[in-house]
Amino acid sequence: MPSDGRCWETLRALRNTSKGRLRYDREWLLRYEDVLEECMSLPKLSSYSGWVVDHILPNTSGHTQESAPSSDNSPSSGSASGLYQSSLLKSPVRSSPQSPSPSSPNGTQSTHESPFTEPIAPQSSRAIKVEGCIRMYELAHRMRGTEGLRQWQEEQERKVRALSEMASEQLKRFDELKELKLHKEFQDLQEVMEKSTREALGHQEKLKEEHRHRAKILNLKLREAEQQRVKQAEQEQLRKEEGQVRLRSLYSLQEEVLQLNQQLDASSQHKELLSVDLAAFQTRGNQLCGLISSIIRTTLESGYPTAENQAEAERALQEMRDLLSDLEQEITRASQVKKKHEEEAKVKRQESQVQQGPAPPTQTSAPSPSPVGAQNEDLQVKVQDSTMQWYQQLQDASAKCVLAFEDLTSSKDSQTKKIKMDLQKAATIPVSQISTIAGSKLKEIFDKIHSLLSGKPVQSGGRSVSVTLNPQGLDFVQYKLAEKFVKQGEEEVASHHEAAFPIAVVASGIWMLHPKVGDLILAHLHKKCPYSVPFYPAFKEGMALEDYQRMLGYQVTDSKVEQQDNFLKRMSGMIRLYAAIIQLQWPYGNRQEAHPHGLNHGWRWLAQVLNMEPLSDVTATLLFDFLEVCGNALMKQYQVQFWKMILLIKEDYFPRIEAITSSGQMGSFIRLKQFLEKCLQRREIPVPRGFLTTSFWRS
């Protein structure tokens, strides 16, 4: 139809325009969703819709009626018109009022003006048809785009669903693979654990087998060891029984030797009858007693006596018997000689009755000194009578002091007990605090002890204490103070030799102001260390052996005697304290006042020790300790006489000590010998270590 041809021409003309040559992107919908949303939004009326209704629609209806017959023949035109009308109703006019109108039939163009200025001339039917075609094209294009978009969306949804399903399936496969992997790892781990368990069980079985094997071997060894132990125990028990038998035998031998020695001492009443010196028999008897005592001490330290020890003791006993037998023979012979002399004298008296005056007395010559190394006849074991009287007086004074405060110590009253404890602490604690720290500190301790003994109150344990709290307080404090001084020598000085001097100077100062304390110090010292007298206690008939050992200074606990080394250590400490006391005076006291127990007592002690038979291991130890502490002071006091005594020790006393000292006890003897030889070589006794100088008292 002519109208269709014109439409296509119009379309070709439009395609040749600048806008028609524009290329449109088919995929714009994916990138410009906002444009699609704008197209799908509800239509809005243009500002020219009112004008179109007033001017275009009336004219359009007239043309429609005129072309109705032709419309029947041209369905495409009708449809186009319908579409056009519908497009007018659904969408606003796209062209602006200023857009140019289609060309007129005569080829001229008319310009539309604004409806607000002047009315626009209605378009021709051709223009309307063209515009309708355009709108129909746009509608068709829009429908195709919408359909394509819908299909694309459906396709995308299908793809998304497919991808989701695929991802879900992949996730399931991943979970299955993971579960499979975990299951496999668990199986591998279980296999490894089972393998390890099997290996461990195998190793355990192997260890059990080795353990059973070793246990079997060990049981065999244990049985062998048990058999060996039983055998050794039986041998030890047998040896112990034999040793106990030998020890009892040694004690019996010692008791018999001591009894024989007493018989020797009892023979002194026949001294006037004997032509020989009785001291030689007594000296040898004492040596034999000391020999057996040293054998017993040595065996107690080492265990039990051996057969050689018993044989040696039996030889000593036999020698003692022979000695007593010889003495008895000498006494018998002397008695016979005396009887014969008496008979001759009787005859002579009868013959000389006619003679006037008695016969001149015979003079006895003085004994000549024995050569070095020979048996010295004037040495003895017993102490001098005057010394024994002095010793006994001190012990009696100590016993009276104990009786004086017996009510205080035995009281059941709590207040009295408290007073006793406070007094004991006030007396003993200051002595325990004595040291070489400073002279001022030592003076404070001395003043505190002096105040306590003087009846003044002193502070002890945060309380005020005085001896006036109890009538027996002073005796109790004096006794405990003296006991503590000696105990410090027994313990502190024995371990630290330098401690002898500060303790001794305080004791010496207290002794000068309170003489009773000094006597009690000597009593305690003599009781614990009889060698400080010097006094060698004798074994008496009927005396228990333990009591005799206590008299000698040994500590006996549960029938067990202390070791010899510990015994010598305690004796050494007390002798050192005694040697320090006799040479020191309290520096703050009266210098003109004589020492209550000075160096003259040290000289007496040394002389009496040298006049007595030495004891194995004891004499050498105590001589060394005494001379090391007090030798310098004695040298300055007695000078030449002191060196004569040192030479006497070296030349005459050393051989005696060496004769009774066994090979295992030579240490103390060698130490004494080297000390004296060095002193004789230097012609000086060195100042003892720890001696308190004048600078100490200024500290």
Curated annotation (Swiss-Prot):
Region (Interaction with NUPL2): 657-699
A Pfam family it matches: GLE1
Comp. bias intervals (Basic and acidic residues): 340-351
Residue stretches of biased makeup (Low complexity): 67-98
Record carries keyword Coiled coil: yes
Ranges where the record places region Interaction with NUP155: 1-29
Keywords recorded for this protein, A-Z: Coiled coil, Cytoplasm, mRNA transport, Nuclear pore complex, Nucleus, Phosphoprotein, Protein transport, Translocation, Transport
Transmembrane segments: none
Annotated spans, Mediates the shuttling between the nucleus and the cytoplasm: 445-484
Key word Coiled coil present: yes
Region (Disordered): 62-123, 334-374
Entry-annotated residues carrying Phosphoserine: 41, 91, 101, 352
Cellular component per GO, a single term: nuclear envelope
Coiled coil: 154-274, 306-356
Any GO BP: poly(A)+ mRNA export from nucleus
Localisation: Nucleus; Cytoplasm; Nucleus, Nuclear pore complex
Gene3D superfamilies, per the entry: GLE1-like
Functional summary from the UniProt entry: Required for the export of mRNAs containing poly(A) tails from the nucleus into the cytoplasm. May be involved in the terminal step of the mRNA transport through the nuclear pore complex (NPC).
The protein's assembly and partners: Associated with the NPC, however it may not be a stable component of the NPC complex since it shuttles between the nucleus and the cytoplasm. Interacts with nuclear pore complex proteins NUP155 and NUPL2.
Name of this protein: mRNA export factor GLE1
Gene source species: Mus musculus (Mouse)
